[in-house]
């Protein structure tokens, strides 16, 4: 959001739209920083035939995604009233700063993914779920997440442990074959 706003101001100047336009944009338009958290392993090769049959057309852009989703929007309170996406049953949070959520996700989801991908692949384990369930790799991933990465974050420990447990549950999702080489 911050970079987008900066870029819009550059174009306002480049296109010589004037100070009135810049004032209007500043006062009337919202540009917000956001964070999306959802594991999307990509094209569902194994299930594509049944998906085509169900949809009754060939969608070459279909992707598989986990059920879990989180959309964090850094915005002032009135935005939640104007855009009540959370009221539609979506996991949307309107917050004063997306930074703690960003740090939590990058550290406790992307971090373990980054750690497990090369060691899993070198061990002949190709799916994230299988790595988590492997006797040695699973313990290693758990130790890295809960014994090292979690300790680097400045958020309530209970919340971090719960998020870490949720991430491990997501990694173990039996319906998502998330390839370690895609990480």
Predicted regions and their residues:
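Substrate/ligand-engaging "lid" and interaction regions
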Residues: 1-183
